[in-house]
Amino acid sequence: MDLEIFDDTNSVPAEKIQLVKDVLEFSGKYLELPEDTEMSVTLMNNEQIHEINLKYRGVDKATDVISFAIEEDDPDELPIILPDDVDFEEPKNIGDMMISMDKVKEQAEYLGHSEDRELGFLTVHGFLHLNGYDHMKAEDEKVMFKLQRDILDAYGLKR
């Protein structure tokens, strides 16, 4: 996977950033995504994610993770036309994810598990949203949460 990870807090330890990268690469392989799949992750604080949550979702509070999936087949987007002899496939950018590192700490403490487990959980949760999974309906929630648990267990971040 082609990952861009940004630390907007300027304080996330390198090993936490590496954990996000490793979990995403593992998750991408688990879902059998193409190697050239692209996405970005921004690690931020509660104040920063609160602003984004309010601006884009109309929710006036901090949250733990927000995912913005890139919609495929945008009818307003013009196709790229290449000569017939050029073999080119554009990498698939699945979108952007934001994680509140403050929420990672708060929720790990509240749930009684490690910050690594919480960070891994939020990373997989947001990643699945970017890949079209959601939990708006009970049946969809069942599918998403099972897959989430399976990925985390296979990676070794069990509860």
Swiss-Prot record:
Pfam families: YbeY. The keyword Lipid biosynthesis does not apply. Its EC number is 3.1.-.-. It comes from the Bacteria. It is found in: Cytoplasm. Its main location: cytoplasm. The keyword Transmembrane helix does not apply. Keywords: Cytoplasm, Endonuclease, Hydrolase, Metal-binding, Nuclease, Ribosome biogenesis, rRNA processing, Zinc. Its cofactor is Zn(2+). It is an enzyme of class 3 (hydrolase). Belongs to the endoribonuclease YbeY family. This is Endoribonuclease YbeY. It comes from Ligilactobacillus salivarius (strain UCC118).
